[in-house]
From Swiss-Prot:
Its EC number is 6.1.1.19. The gene is MSR1. It comes from Saccharomyces cerevisiae (strain ATCC 204508 / S288c) (Baker's yeast). One of its GO terms (molecular function) is arginine-tRNA ligase activity. The lineage of its organism: Eukaryota, Fungi, Dikarya, Ascomycota, Saccharomycotina. This is Arginine--tRNA ligase, mitochondrial. Keywords: Aminoacyl-tRNA synthetase, ATP-binding, Ligase, Mitochondrion, Nucleotide-binding, Protein biosynthesis, Transit peptide. PANTHER family: ARGININE--TRNA LIGASE, MITOCHONDRIAL-RELATED, ARGINYL-TRNA SYNTHETASE. A motif ('HIGH' region) lies at residues 188-198.
Length: 643
């Protein structure tokens, strides 16, 4: 209605972990220089060199140029099995699974998936026949399953240099035909607390946006603010009574909330005294009516509250490493779009008039969806009608291939109603909408038990992290900006506590557990990353080029080999997270890498070793740090170098 806020000045926002690349189409392009470098590193182990064109199944969307080691293993397995059984390549490729445990191999093939008779006997026979084919290092039969292990020499030579060359691009892929996705997330209500549900929506939505980009999509991050409705009438009246310009400029969200609380208390007193139709209520209705009618003064007041709030939100979001391309809101949905929605309701015979209101009866398609009012008897539209209008506008203006709504599971019924209505309006693109839900945070409050504002939570996490850091005077003296680092550690603690389990699960917000440097926490991830950065700094005599071209022939320590196997899994982990839309998939993987790094770090040293031993070891540690950096950035964390 009054113009969507498009953020052209990206410097206002926190730097996106991928922002060193072009906004659209930054994904790995594998240019000629990279391809040549990689091919020089490839070793000839008697396997056919495959191109990405060979992958004609669910793995077709691979980057041009070299493919990841586990993809080569997939191809070698499918070729070998096809040669001995005649089974179609695509059936084998789609049946192969990643493993959750290293002792189960690098890839797993459940033989029942490819419909062979007597899968146990066949597994035993094939394990013998396949043991020396291509990059397959070992094959084990376990009941009806075949476990495949990469050839150790190929594993190390193809994985470690690959990571060091690709750096931040490792694990990502470039789609041949880039699709567009709109991710709507966060969506706080102006003048109301930024509560725990908004926090979850914000960090999960930020992760999903990063994940879609990593998988080759063009992403539009949208914040759909609660910036319209009767509360703005109350807010305007309240600000006349209790507003303070200086406080508004300094703390807009907090001050508007305080004003809103006070005016609601006054309103409650009026209602008790039987004056609800005049006084505050009447003034609020009058202001909002003027706002809807486009009154210049009302719009000026509303726009000021909204603009100051957005400016404050941007500052707060930057601490979470979150940015938005569009700040939209309920106010942005045009009357034309809502009228178009109502016209389609009537045209498709979806609405019935009940007591003057327009109602859609969804029980004819699903009993649980019930009836939905789309227009009140006085002619005003409801939230759902605005959402329908907004979806229509977004399809017209943004031309998305998919739109994702990151909204609490408390809204599951509402989102099902919304999607069903769009489907019955015969919008073909209704199938491209997805609701990503999540559970509730229990026990989330400040230590004083006050109303929760996001800034307060972030401040408390930072202060607690800083207090822990100050316990080690020697280490904190080496940190350039302890306050900033503490803020990053505090944010990491909040994000990882949230993302450790499946997003649909409720969880208990626990300050002490969240900020612990022991166990699987955000600070532990940061500690591992900074530890590896320290190793790189103390080994700076060895250049990146030396690490890329290291001789790995003598790298046989089992712990380091297991670490490289984990690093080789990262592209598959990204794919699995993309399929499930679960941040916990990435978090679980990160802790596996950290635990393996820790077991290696204690026993397998770089310092004091001759170059032919130190360089390949350092290459593995440096590749590990890069993968940690990539995965942490994907989750929305900013990895620290010192802490």
């Amino acid at each position: 209605m009054f113009g969507i806020v498009y953020l052209k000045n990206r410097s206002l926002l926190c730097k996106n972990p991928f922002s060193s690349y072009p906004r659209y189409g930054f994904m790995p392009s594998f240019d000629t220089q990279f391809s040549n470098q990689f091919r020089k590193l490839e070793i000839n182990i008697g396997r056919k060199r495959y191109s990405s064109k060979t992958l004609n199944t669910k793995y077709t969307d691979q980057p041009e140029g070299p493919i990841y080691p586990l993809d080569v293993l997939r191809l070698d397995i499918s070729k070998a099995l096809h040669d001995i059984s005649g089974i179609d390549h695509s059936l084998i490729l789609n049946a192969l699974e990643s493993t959750n445990s290293m002792d189960r191999g690098d890839l797993l093939l459940p033989l029942p998936k490819i419909k062979v008779a007597d899968p146990v006997a066949v597994a035993n026979r094939w394990a013998i026949e396949l043991s020396t084919h291509g990059c397959i290092g070992k094959v084990c039969a376990k009941g009806p399953f075949l476990q495949f292990f990469l050839d150790q020499r190929y594993l190390i030579q193809s994985t470690v240099p690959n990571i060091l060359l690709q750096k931040g691009k490792y694990g990502q892929k470039k789609s041949r035909h880039q699709k567009k996705v709109v991710v709507e997330f966060s969506s706080p209500n102006i003048a109301k607390p930024f509560h725990a549900g908004h926090l979850r929506s914000t960090i999960i939505g930020g992760f999903l946006s990063n994940l879609y980009e990593a998988m080759g999509w063009s992403v539009t991050r949208m914040n759909y603010l609660g910036d319209w409705g009767r509360q703005f009438g109350l807010l305007a009246v309240g600000f006349k009574r209790y507003g303070d310009e200086k406080t508004l400029q300094k703390q807009p969200i907090q001050h508007l909330f305080d004003v809103y609380v006070k005016i609601n208390m006054d309103l409650a007193k009026e209602e008790i005294n039987g004056n609800s139709k005049c006084g505050i209520s009447g003034e609020a209705r009058s202001f909002f009516k003027n706002l809807e009618n486009g009154d210049e003064n009302a719009i000026k007041i509303w726009n000021r509250f909204r603009s100051l709030s957005i400016h404050h939100y941007i500052q707060t979001y930057s601490r979470l490493n979150i940015n938005f391309d569009i700040f939209s809101g309920e106010s942005q949905v045009s009357k034309e779009s809502m009228n178009e929605a109502l016209d389609i309701f009537r045209k498709n015979n979806l609405v019935k008039e009940i007591d003057g209101a327009l109602v859609i009866d969804l029980t004819q398609w699903s009993k649980r969806l019930g009836r939905v009012v789309v227009q009140k008897s006085d002619g005003t539209t409801l939230y759902l009608t605005r959402d329908v209008g907004a979806a229509i506008e977004r399809k017209k203006n943004l031309h998305f291939d998919k739109m994702v709504y990151v909204i609490s599971s408390q809204q599951d019924l509402y989102m099902s109603q919304f999607f069903m209505i769009l489907k019955k309006m015969n919008f073909e693109w209704a199938k491209d909408l997805q609701h990503i839900n999540f559970g509730m945070v229990q026990g989330m409050s400040t230590r004083k038990g006050n109303v929760v504002f996001l800034d307060t939570i972030l401040d408390e996490a930072r202060d607690k992290a800083l207090q822990i850091m100050e316990n080690n005077k020697m280490k904190i003296s080496q940190v350039d900006n302890p306050q900033r680092v503490a803020d990053l550690i505090g944010v990491s603690a909040i994000i990882i506590q949230d993302m450790k389990s499946k997003r649909i699960n409720n969880y208990e917000f626990n300050w002490n557990r969240m900020l612990s440097f022991e166990g699987d926490t955000g600070p532990y991830l940061q500690y591992t990353h900074s530890r590896l950065r320290s190793l790189e700094r103390t080994s700076s005599d060895f250049t990146t080029d030396m690490l890329i071209h290291a001789d790995f022939s003598n790298l046989n320590e089992p712990q380091l080999v297991e670490l490289v196997r984990l690093l080789a899994q990262y592209p598959d982990v990204l794919r699995r997270a993309f399929e499930t839309q679960e941040p916990a998939t990435i978090v679980t993987y990160l802790f596996k890498v950290c635990h393996q790094v820790s077991s290696c770090y204690k026993k397998i040293w770089v310092s004091g070793k001759p170059a032919d031993i130190a360089i390949p070891r350092l290459a593995v540690y440096s590749a590990s740090r890069q993968v940690l950096h990539n995965a942490m950035s994907l989750l929305g964390l900013v990895p620290v170098d010192r802490m």
